[in-house]
Curated annotation (Swiss-Prot):
GO terms for biological process: angiogenesis; cell adhesion; chemical synaptic transmission; neurotransmitter receptor localization to postsynaptic specialization membrane; neurotransmitter secretion; postsynaptic density assembly; presynaptic modulation of chemical synaptic transmission; regulation of postsynaptic membrane neurotransmitter receptor levels. Residues 41-51 have a biased composition (Low complexity). This is Neurexin-3-beta. It comes from Mus musculus. Residues 36-492 are extracellular. Neuronal cell surface protein that may be involved in cell recognition and cell adhesion. May mediate intracellular signaling. Functions as part of a trans-synaptic complex by binding to cerebellins and postsynaptic GRID1. This interaction helps regulate the activity of NMDA and AMPA receptors at hippocampal synapses without affecting synapse formation. NRXN3B-CBLN2-GRID1 complex transduce presynaptic signals into postsynaptic AMPAR response. The gene is Nrxn3. It is found in: Presynaptic cell membrane. Pfam families: Laminin_G_2, Syndecan. CDD domains: LamG.
Amino acid sequence: MHLRIHPRRSPPRRPAWTLGIWSLFWGCIVSSVWSSSNVASSSSSSPGSHSQQEHHFHGSKHHSVPISIYRSPVSLRGGHAGATYIFGKSGGLILYTWPANDRPSTRSDRLAVGFSTTVKDGILVRIDSAPGLGDFLQLHIEQGKIGVVFNIGTVDISIKEERTPVNDGKYHVVRFTRNGGNATLQVDNWPVNEHYPTGNTDNERLQMVKQKIPFKYNRPVEEWLQEKGRQLTIFNTQAQIAIGGKDKGRLFQGQLSGLYYDGLKVLNMAAENNPNIKINGSVRLVGEVPSVSGTTQTTSMPPEMSTTVMETTTTMATTTTRKNRSTASIQPTSDDLVSSAECSSDDEDFVECEPSTGRSDKSLSTSIFEGGYKAHAPKWESKDFRPNKVSETSRTTTTSLSPELIRFTASSSSGMVPKLPAGKMNNRDLKPQPDIVLLPLPTAYELDSTKLKSPLITSPMFRNVPTANPTEPGIRRVPGASEVIRESSSTTGMVVGIVAAAALCILILLYAMYKYRNRDEGSYQVDETRNYISNSAQSNGTLMKEKQASSKSGHKKQKNKDKEYYV
């Protein structure tokens, strides 16, 4: 058998275009990843750059804005924001009651809250145990200084910040921790106040009188002492949390933000209409706008909150305008912070707002508490945005009404019930203005080409928990939804670009694989005809040789016949 092997061609070198395709493929992937990371870093670094500039600009100015909004990052969105409530001059109360079968007993407690006030005496928060036990924990202001008093068994334990008064109208954050009888209290970034109880002398007294106690009473006495020791470390059967001090006659007047107690965000729960929370008196959630007279009341404020025009209970209103933002149910100019500064009346007086004249529509509105709680408005470098001075008669600065609000007011007389979204009081485009920072807390006014955003504040909680994020009346939005809407336009282009680049790379890769599989390769082939001829020749070897010899001789003879001779 003869095997004829065609020469196998060695595999050709990988052509240069294949290397080019691979390099293009990896280049697309690297560029896509780099562009996405670059966009993410730029979007995350922009707020930081604003805050750095604001600290630099405002290094020599110490102004505080009582009402602030913390716009949380992505990782903190979705239910983590706090709420801010304003307590008026007539006093108010937010009361949270634990269910009867879910009353906790704690060995350690953590309380934190942000506040701003000018009163010298008042109760901010008080936690009481079930009736008959007598355990309590109370955060209060006494003679302008913040302090905590608690009783978990026998005597009242007090801890107080003695250095500096806190009724200066500025925003402060107070943190209190308790572990047994030990306690700490800190205001802002000031030094921590600590309290450690003295040693228990019951055992020493027991040793002294033990000889006089009958033997059969020794065991009950020891058990009684052990029970007393347990009561000195455990806050038993907590029943309710009272905010505002109205139930005790020590009214708090000012604002409270982001209250946190042992995992409960009570102000958040109040803003969400928790069934275990009741609100009484002059209490208003920041972001709610009082209804115009003639319309139905859209807020949960009781009628006894009504006061006179001069007894305004609002703080500085940061009215902002957001353009080019719209959702299915939110107006483009929503997501603003308004504290009843659109009218010269109190936030509890639902009287009709009359439009004013002049240039007051270009300024921020401020109002103060009569007899105490005063809003500190920021100083503006630009004259166009300098707030109007507070008038001596009404002590309230008002803004002019937009045409939309005038139409709302006119429609109210005809029976219509409009809903006034927060921030509808000023719809003019605002020019960029200098950044503002609240000290000692890092705050900021975010700037844009056509809008002014509210400042940032740090959380009064222990681990950077955000505070006030007001919502619009009638619309309950998840905190952080505005940022998601604002970022969607920038991320959509990035996602489309990444998908297109990936699809192009995949097509190029498939084409390269197709060309590589269909290339020409060397092959082996067996010549069967030669195989049969050789088999027939092997049967008679001599015949084959004779045929070869005869063929050679015949060929020679033929050659000889063809020869020609010339003479």
